[in-house]
Amino acid sequence: MMSATSITAPTPRPSASASPGLTALPVDLSHSPVLGIIGVILGAGIVTLAGRLLSLGLADLKGSVGFGADDGAWIPSAFNVALMFIGPFSVYLGGLLGIRKVLFYSAAAFTLISALLSLVHNYALMVGLLAAAGLTSGTFYPLTLTFALKNIPLRYLALVVSLYATCIEGAVNFAPSIYGFCRNNLSWQWIFWIPALLTPVMMACIYFGIPETPKPQTKKQPPSFMGFVFLSAGFALLYAALDQGQRLDWWRSGTFTALFASGMFLLLCSLVRRLRSPNFLVDLPYLRQWNTILLAVALFAYRFVLLATIIIIPQSLSVHGLDAQQYGPSVLWTAIFELFLAFVGALLLSKGFDARLLMATGFAAVAFACLINANFTSAWAPENYFRSELLMGVGQSFAIMGLVASLVQQAAFSGGLSAPQRALTFAAFFHTVRLFGGQVGVAFMGHFIADREKLHSNLLGLHVQAGSWVTDENLRQLAAGLSAKSSGLMAATGRAAEIIASKLRLQAYSLTFIDGFHLVAWACAGILLLTTLLRKAPMNFAQISLLQQEFISTKRKQS
């Protein structure tokens, strides 16, 4: 096993026979790597797209099926909580049944469930099927990337990393335009049918592009799954608490308190179970490494940075009454540009560019884009974001490509690929950080926007007081203009007061979104400092590819 702290820098042409890390290199290679790559990136993008389309189409789904506001709030939560549950549990499933088998059965079930969801009109059945869809699709994230690291030739690894990262990010920004087109030209049911159509393509690519791996070897006694159940259920309940916290008013709600307390109790149970009966499919000590911890923090920060395009920009336009198709172009530019940048990032990595520097460049670009967006006013339209969104696209693409590339290097050179339990533990850990950390960021940003809007409304309201000559003059002028289409002077004055209140609220939101952009910029500045603490990988992607080729040549000569 190789540790990140004990490997010395390699020579430009590393020797295959001298390197002790050769045993971690994948040797069961795909004979159709292009199909394997497509299958991996589809697995990442399908889940992201499905969750985003569900959130965007929630209002239409509730209106068409007849669900109330409170019931509808739990619909996307059912899908996302199930994703959170299956993340840690995928370690058990992948280690016990085999990665390829779990992926195929999960993909088949997800396809069937997605096709049936549009036909469901019963609330309990809808929530149950969405939970099942989350459970089945939640295996795509950790297992597809683990599968790729074990089977894709390393000369394609830079491209796989770039496309995998870009597909996750691009699906988020493509979703508003896709949903807007489907709703206006087709029907809202396509939020379920699109994932159902894409998943069989992923299954075919994995079947023909990646060879079957042998069933993982286990000890004589079967592994226990209770620890996984406790851990997964604990994180899932905490996820649900954070997801509903703002709507339920946090600790003032008994539901939130019960979810949070139950989640913490189950996490404590999983810890006790781990101490009393460790599971050989989980290698927690392997995660106690400097770069692993820092990269987990970086992944959490990146998920928070994404909220600039997931929450702040859409909400800054939706307060004007714009729907998904109308504000979609403001983030669509980012998604289109990222597809081109994926190949640029792959070229840079394949030429030996430092993944840490690529990640730092990306976060710096996002920070500058947020500072440009901090000039936001209530008069902005989607076109005003086009300039900054190009820079945002560069930043988000390079940041996620550098981050995923650093994760791959850390897994390879810390012994993560030398044992199945380490690879699965590594993938499940970062999958959990990505989902749970992302929800922590969403909950914080939602609470931040709500509180800052109240603050700015109160501060602006201090200057709009009854009896002030400025306020009274504005009321009189507006009432005079509205009197012709009002039933009387009192009605016209009431409508004028509503217009002033709406303008006040719009300005309060404008100041809130400016604060949000500044917050994201400061988060980028913090992650830039963190990247300076990351230790350099022993080899870059160009040297890794050369190492594998020499290793395979040596094996062939020996045979």
Residue ranges and their predicted role:
Residues 1-49, 63:
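Cytosolic juxtamembrane N-terminal segment immediately preceding the first transmembrane helix
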Residues 33-50, 54-56, 69-70, 75-76, ...:
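12-transmembrane solute porter fold
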Residues 57-85, 125:
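Extracellular/periplasmic helix-loop-helix junction of adjacent transmembrane segments
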Residues 61-62, 93-94, 126, 178-186, ...:
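Interfacial helix-cap and linker-helix signal at transmembrane-aqueous boundaries
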Residues 77-92, 141-145, 332-345:
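Central cavity-lining transmembrane alpha-helices of secondary-active solute carriers
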Residues 87-227:
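Helix-loop-helix hairpins in multi-pass membrane proteins, especially solute transporters
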Residues 180-298:
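Hydrophobic transmembrane-helix bundles of small-molecule transporters
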Residues 410-417, 429-559:
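Hydrophobic transmembrane architecture of multi-pass small-molecule transporters
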